[in-house]
């Protein structure tokens, strides 16, 4: 495993990370993949340290994998959700952060529905903070696990054509992946109806397609995104049936991509909406289960890096 230092106090986003820093995290995660596949999954690297997962939104994959990551590194892990906490009694995010800070924890993993909330919280605590997803802003560990998944299958990130398809407008996963893939030299395409693509894409270094068949031509990786109804106010698509017809991934559309193109999805999937079960469960080309596996290793790497007793810069990314 790498001994490289991570020069940031927090991991709040991918934007601003240097390619070398991304590579260091991925290289470290590689070692944890092999550890997790062994009979002895536990390593007491974080023995005596405390990790709190503070989630203001529901989560299965992210929260569970952070819990596993912390426990496999020997940390004391506490899961907190807004339901059943003082948040329901009117406590503010900052008050909650300062309360937890007084308990001398080492790492705080936060998911929050408001973009920028995690950065605000990070300015009020002494511990390391990891962004577990904030609104439509960023989800850095998802982008890192996606990158590791791609790199293990394709052997590289640079030069690959990656299509991100679906509800990009409301997706923090899409934003973090765009930042990471651009930084690592991949070519990013965004595919979706105009209503589900954000403004300002010309500044993000991506190609935009409103025709999925044209957008999938010659791609190496297809990332499908679900429609995030919980972040919508109003109707963004005419109907589920029509959306699947034009923008759902099925066997016919998959055939337009390269013969060895792989399929990814951050989950949860809406089968029959953005992806057909036939391709989602393709044992040769679907990497969806591999993404889940890589998630634990990547989050172990992030916890490892952020808790090393090394001199860190005061700036946070």
UniProtKB/Swiss-Prot annotation:
Cited InterPro entries: Asp/Orn_carbamoyltranf_P-bd (IPR006132), Asp/Orn_carbamoylTrfase (IPR006130), Asp/Orn_carbamoylTrfase_sf (IPR036901), Asp_carbamoyltransf (IPR002082), Asp_carbamoyltransf_Asp/Orn-bd (IPR006131)
Family that this chain belongs to: Belongs to the aspartate/ornithine carbamoyltransferase superfamily. ATCase family.
Pfam families the record matches: OTCace, OTCace_N
Domain of life: Bacteria
Organism: Paramagnetospirillum magneticum (strain ATCC 700264 / AMB-1)
Keyword Transcription: no
Protein name, as recorded: Aspartate carbamoyltransferase catalytic subunit
Gene3D superfamilies in UniProt: Aspartate/ornithine carbamoyltransferase
Xref: PANTHER family: ASPARTATE CARBAMOYLTRANSFERASE, ORNITHINE CARBAMOYLTRANSFERASE, MITOCHONDRIAL
GO biological process, any: 'de novo' UMP biosynthetic process
Residues that hold L-aspartate according to the record: 89, 172, 226
Complex and partners: Heterododecamer (2C3:3R2) of six catalytic PyrB chains organized as two trimers (C3), and six regulatory PyrI chains organized as three dimers (R2).
